[in-house]
Amino acid sequence: MKRYLLTILLSLWCACAWAAGSVTVKGRVLCGGRGVEGVWVSDGEEFACTDKRGNYRLQAGADNRFVFVCVPAGYDAPVEKGVVRYFHPLPADGKSCDFTLLRRAGDDSRYGFIAIADPQIWAPKEFAKLAAAADDIAATVRSYGGMPFHGICCGDIVSHDHSLYGRYNEVMERTGITFRNAMGNHDMKVYGRSYETSFSKFEQMYGPVYYSFDVGRIHYVVLDDNFFIGRDYFYIGYLEERQMRWLEKDLARVQPGSTVVVCLHIPSTCEEQDRKQFRYDRAGSTMTNHRGLYEILKPYRAHIISGHTLSLIHISEPTRHAQI
């Protein structure tokens, strides 16, 4: 009897401890006022899928910062002042958190994709060059006669002056297409005490530093491999375990053999040598633990697009890696 009672008490203690570290988030994913079925919602750790009425219920980690929708093919998220609004701050326990999607006009199985990297805007006078580039992108989009496009900036949006994010967003709206963003090392909040202090400015403007979405038959993933080491402005290329675990769960719903495009800032590799042998003096140039990422991506037709080096390199098998 004592053993039975002890088992019950331990079970209750474990349940309470687990509940104390989590919050229940519930809500709906809507399009035109109607629920959308089969949409995945995440807190950066766990996932939940909407039912026929668009309802979801997610047991989220209490220390997570956002809840966000993985925008499915055929849909867009609203864009406000150049920012894609697919996320909300993590609400209090039991509070409702709804998302609105917009139905894409026509078929999105054939579309254009534009990737840029390293604008590194450090002063207002730099925006003239960015505006010229945005106008060039807009002209390119128009030349395709109405084909839908979307774009991603692979990090280093600004050069540590986060007050310039708003103006960057305004200029990029001139492209006429939705631009999402990955975080770069120049987007970090530096001189903090740990990695966890480095992404607050980016998140205040753009939301989660890692997320996913679908366009047509392609699954896109954006990751943050800029690992601030808590000293001055120094960093290494490193993908934390938290993101790898989330990525494994995210890809579990993607059919093996499908095309997956991963966008991040620091390249996973630049040459054959860095895939064979680690060098301390190159720890900030490439992702030091890229093998773990490659293993996760192995079942898919994976392409990795990055920035950071201000050069153009294309590496095919075995990594299918494009670096901007």
For every predicted segment, state its role.
Residues 42-60:
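Short, acidic Ser/Thr/Gly-rich low-complexity loop/linker segments typical of extracellular
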